[in-house]
């Protein structure tokens, strides 16, 4: 396979009947100047398949300007692509950026393991820098600690205008790296709606964050608000102009959630 072959363009974690989610270009090989190929792909994220067999996949991930290391969205797009090209087991290992992450196929969607999520309460905290009313505040961690705040309703969630300095201030005050705002319910029968912010991580708002959704799953578990029948949760991420839909699989735990997997659909849009 040569570098001249065009990539397959996928839209990952997009809601039904929507142009949201993340655009990812998937290259079936990893030959030549990968940075130049990513720059010419016309997508904000490109993933290259270095190696694949029935039980493992090795990937490299690039933005148009630099190698990214790892990306859940990139992995989901690559797995969806490879599923159409070769035979994969329902559980595989994904190698990227020096990490190995288990993935599983569940109900036609690939999910990546985020691990166990622990939740702690937050002592008295000045949230005035955020400029919104809150119903509950916790810290949840799935490898990285995030401040997780419940707001009044979907209107308040969608009306929130993020201020990088204000969010960074409450993150520093709590020793967290990101902020998740959420409220129950959502479009297309989602059980919860949320937004994810991370000025201390180098971005203001992320439109589709698997790790931060996993933290939210942990908070709902600690509150006893997770579904008790299917052990699955649908989340509507509500970044203005770029909605996303994520699926989580979990095992309930007293102080959060165990064995959390997060993913969603990846749809090929071209060629």
Which residues are covered by each model-predicted region?
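Active-site proximal loop and beta-alpha junction motif in alpha/beta enzyme cores
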Residues: 1-70, 75-271
């Amino acid at each position: 396979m040569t570098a001249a072959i065009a990539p397959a363009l996928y839209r990952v974690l997009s809601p039904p009947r929507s142009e949201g989610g993340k655009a990812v270009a998937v290259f079936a090989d990893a030959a030549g100047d990968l940075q130049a190929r990513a720059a010419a792909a016309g997508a904000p994220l490109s993933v290259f398949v270095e190696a694949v067999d029935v039980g493992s996949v090795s990937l490299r991930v690039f933005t148009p300007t630099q190698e990214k290391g790892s990306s859940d969205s990139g992995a989901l797009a690559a797995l969806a692509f490879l599923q159409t090209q070769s035979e994969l087991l329902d559980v595989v290992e994904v190698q990227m950026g020096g990490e190995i992450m288990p993935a599983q196929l569940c109900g036609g969607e690939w999910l990546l393991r985020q691990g166990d999520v622990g939740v702690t309460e937050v002592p008295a905290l000045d949230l005035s820098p955020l400029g919104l009313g809150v119903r509950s505040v916790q810290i949840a961690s799935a490898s990285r600690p995030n401040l997780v705040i419940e707001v009044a309703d979907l209107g308040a969630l969608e009306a929130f205008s993020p201020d990088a300095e204000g969010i960074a201030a409450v993150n520093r005050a709590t020793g967290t790296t990101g902020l998740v705002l959420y409220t129950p319910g959502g479009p297309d029968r989602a059980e919860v709606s949320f937004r994810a912010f991370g000025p201390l991580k180098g971005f203001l708002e992320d439109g589709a964050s698997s790790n931060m959704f996993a933290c939210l799953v942990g908070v709902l578990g600690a509150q006893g608000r997770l579904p008790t029948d299917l052990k699955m949760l649908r989340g509507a991420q509500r970044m203005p102009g770029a909605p996303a839909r994520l699926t989580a699989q979990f095992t309930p735990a007293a102080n959060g959630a165990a064995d959390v997997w997060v993913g969603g659909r990846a749809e090929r849009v071209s060629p």
